[in-house]
Amino acid sequence: MIDLRSPNALLSDYVERYAHLSPEPSRQLQQRMDYNVRADAPAEPASKPRWLQSRACTLTPEQALDRAKGALLGLAIGDAVGTTLEFLPRDREHVNDMVGGGPFRLAAGEWTDDTSMALCLADTYVSQGKFDYATYANALVRWYRHGENSVNGRCFDIGNATRNALEGWLREGIGWQGNYDPSTAGNGSIIRLAPTAIFRRHSLSASWWESVTQSSVTHNADEAVNCCQLLAAQLHLALNGADKEETLAPAVRSLRPRPMIINAGEYKQKSRDQIRSSGYVVDTLEAALWAVWNSNNFHDAILLAANLADDADSVAATAGQLAGALYGVSGMPPEWVEKVAWSQHIQKLAQELFDRAPQVDELDALLYGKR
């Protein structure tokens, strides 16, 4: 077990023990790299990697919808519970309910930027029938400038990388490229991921790649993107009927060293004192998965995550996405479902994402000829 804040060189050596979780090169790549193969030899047919094969849904339509609503509503509930302890040192205070307050003096049930950005993402899918980069960037700008999709009509709690990206979009439009530096690997794109997972729930490969695209609007650092991909894969499993053990089991995935170590499940052996809850995306994802793993219901997962403090709203929002996808709205405390702001609107958006979800991955048809 290793500290994920260890130096890169040490982590690169350490992660070799999980080489069995890295995908093998495709047959097409192996052929291109084989110097014994003639240049004019017939190309290997394109085939989808096994590790990107989707999980068959084992839920009834009603159960699947319950989990889809749970993923998006769970994000908002986690955000609303966690904001009470946002920016506080761990254990200075504790929370055992949805009580509001915190640095922004919110009413009980109100949430922060995590949910606002997720609602902008959901609106993009619903209005366009797909993810559209410019539509999403402009939705975020309307939130940033005018408070659209904010619980109190104004933008607050926006992260530095997100602000920098939106200012870049306003200056340069589609030509803006930024936030690639490792120092910008904040959690701003993972905390809003649920709409992508719901809309693309029928296809693991679509969830995997579209989590990259939605992240790239504000966060392009490798670890920010890679952590989105890992959570997207886990949400795909949960939304299609997996239980906690299957969802959080190590799996073959193409990941950088720190996300790979999280994928391998080392957080399952860590104590609370070994878990960080900062806004660094690696810390946020590890803390969220630790909270889900060490609980057996939605309520306890949210409180475990929120009481880690520091970036408590984002850790709890990330945990809430996965716990909501595992336990559904039916597994949430009814008083939280009722109290969280915009509850019915959020559930309605989740239903629209669910109903409009494509049955096939268009990229599969392009790459592998599948219809």
UniProtKB/Swiss-Prot annotation:
Keyword annotations from UniProtKB, A to Z: Hydrolase, Magnesium, Metal-binding
Keyword Cell division: no
GO molecular function: ADP-ribosylarginine hydrolase activity; metal ion binding
Catalytic activity, EC: 3.2.2.19
Reactions listed under catalytic activity: N(omega)-(ADP-D-ribosyl)-L-arginyl-[protein] + H2O = ADP-D-ribose + L-arginyl-[protein]
Residue numbers spanned by region N-terminal extension: 1-61
Disulfide links within the chain: none
InterPro entries: ADP-ribosylglycohydrolase, Ribosyl_crysJ1, Ribosyl_crysJ1_sf, Tri1-like
Class in the EC hierarchy, top level: hydrolase
Cofactor: Mg(2+)
Binding site for Mg(2+): T112, D113, D114, D157, D313
Keyword Protein transport among record annotations: no
Recorded superkingdom: Bacteria
Cofactor note as given: Binds 1 Mg(2+) ion per subunit.
Domain notes: The N-terminal extension probably forms a projection that reaches into the active site of cognate toxin Tre1-Pp where it occludes the active site.
Stated role: Immunity component of an interbacterial competition system (also called effector-immunity systems). Expression in E.coli neutralizes the toxic effects of non-cognate S.proteamaculans effector protein Tre1 (Tre1-Sp); cannot be co-purified with Tre1-Sp from E.coli, suggesting they do not form a stable complex. Probably acts as an arginine mono-ADP-ribosylhydrolase, mediating the removal of mono-ADP-ribose attached to arginine residues on proteins.
Family named by the database record: Belongs to the ADP-ribosylglycohydrolase family.
Entry protein name: ADP-ribosylarginine hydrolase Tri1
Organism: Pseudomonas putida (strain GB-1)
Designated gene of the protein: tri1
